[in-house]
Amino acid sequence: MRSDMIKKGLERTPHRALLKGTGVPQSQMEKPFIGVATSFTDLIPGHVGMRDLERYIEKGIHSGGGYAFFFGIPGVCDGISMGHKGMHYSLPTRELIADMVESVAEAHRLDGLVLLTNCDKITPGMLMAAARLDIPCIVVTAGPMMSGRGEAGRKYSFVTDTFEAMARYKAGVIDAQELQVCEDNACPGMGSCQGLFTANTMAILTETLGMSLPRCGTALAVSALKRRIAFASGERIVDLVKDNVTPRSILTRAAFENAIRVDLALGGSSNTVLHLLAIAHEAEVELPLETFDILAKETPQLASMNPAGEHFMEDLDTAGGVAGVLMQLGDKIKDNPTVMGLTIKQLAASIANVDETVIRPLSNPVKKEGGIAILSGNIAPKGAVVKQSGVSAAMMNFTGTARCFDSEEAAMAAIMEGKIVAGDCVVIRYEGPKGGPGMREMLAPTAAIMGLGLGDSVALITDGRFSGGTRGPCIGHISPEAAEGGPIALVEEGDRIELDIPGRRLQLLVDDETLAKRRRNWQAPAPKIRTGWLARYAKVVTSANTGAVTSAD
């Protein structure tokens, strides 16, 4: 075992003494040392229930014959950090989390890891660490929040009834009392936000990748089932250590293709493009951006999930969960091993019935194509991403007038002041991985556009990214980004921009000669942040089209 390096032999006398100083009895020294990377914090609703899950994981590890050690991993709530300076830090924490898990596991020679996670950047950061370390690992996602409940059976959700409600109030559609009711009911308790936003999409994809146990991706945070999954995961990691089952034996090209197909079938968050690319990078699996679009054209959307649709995570769980989606996808799924001991096709076969009002069959899809599309054109030569499942038919083809803003705050002010009108195409730039820095989510502007009733007449494009709660004609991840001299930096107020989602085109309707002249006059802006972690991050982060990973090259 790896842990023998810190607990066996004469030379490890000091090491054993220190371990005994933590309370480890001599009788436990022969057991596998299992690290539990916990991202508990009472700052995030999705993580406040983790103390309970920690207990069940620890019980499972000890029941399975291992010895548990806990260490803490930070977490950032994208909702709380949204719309201000805090959002600069969200995506960069993904890299910090991967580095911290790697550092503790390697420094202490842990034999295996249980990765307790839930929210947006924490789950991909944990998976990146698992792929990088390639020691036995299992992931426990803490589970979704229930939908909020109101009078006459109304269901509330975080994004629609907070960010969008704010804009509806500003427009006079609802009054202050209605807004207060929304605020009080949108988040009824612990768990990751209720729709198919980034956290829940990543939990589902973690199960699809084979890195968590059945139902882990959809079982509610408040459920006893989640506790049982936590216990079983603790037991299972000891078996994985004994059998030396490592993440790279599971995170194959087939696993990533399966995850993409499930993502597309459900209409998941566009952030998953960044995260799957980054996890594949750590697993040394080649996964070009174009893969998402190739699979989207042959994978129909089978569910209509909140925020763009009517179903919540609780509905998906009772309808069949991940296994139900896999069963409906049938032969489009490739067989692959998992941490659960079953193959992915065996998991699909384990479910008896699927509620086809929630997870439709291939013969009756919600839409003929999957939820994500990859666009390109002279404004995005290395690609851009749109969650087409959240775009109305009226906006699948659109030509608009560029309204240019060099920050999210400037765009948000213009939207809320009524300066954006039907026929406009909002351009938010210098918000990419380097330029932001941190590639902030543009949820506030997109929610404001939807809340003001402009979702069928205004588009938004950016080198930033979007929340999983975003809906509407919002194109992000434009690469190269403005800070690197990408063509989005050359767009001027009043230019015409053409969006053709079915044709996968995003085109600035300006001739090459004019663009060449603008490029000669363009100067890179000074870095927005010159000290601290974000300044270092901006120097080493790569483009969105490669997952916005950090590189030592």
Curated annotation (Swiss-Prot):
Catalysed reaction equations from the record: (2R)-2,3-dihydroxy-3-methylbutanoate = 3-methyl-2-oxobutanoate + H2O; (2R,3R)-2,3-dihydroxy-3-methylpentanoate = (S)-3-methyl-2-oxopentanoate + H2O
Active site: S467 (proton acceptor)
Residues in coiled coil: none
Residue numbers binding Mg(2+): D78, D120, K121, E441
GO terms under biological process: isoleucine biosynthetic process; L-valine biosynthetic process
N6-carboxylysine, modified sites: K121
Function as written in the Swiss-Prot or TrEMBL entry: Functions in the biosynthesis of branched-chain amino acids. Catalyzes the dehydration of (2R,3R)-2,3-dihydroxy-3-methylpentanoate (2,3-dihydroxy-3-methylvalerate) into 2-oxo-3-methylpentanoate (2-oxo-3-methylvalerate) and of (2R)-2,3-dihydroxy-3-methylbutanoate (2,3-dihydroxyisovalerate) into 2-oxo-3-methylbutanoate (2-oxoisovalerate), the penultimate precursor to L-isoleucine and L-valine, respectively.
PANTHER family: D-XYLONATE DEHYDRATASE (PTHR43661), D-XYLONATE DEHYDRATASE YAGF-RELATED (PTHR43661:SF3)
Record's protein name: Dihydroxy-acid dehydratase
Gene source species: Geotalea daltonii (strain DSM 22248 / JCM 15807 / FRC-32) (Geobacter daltonii)
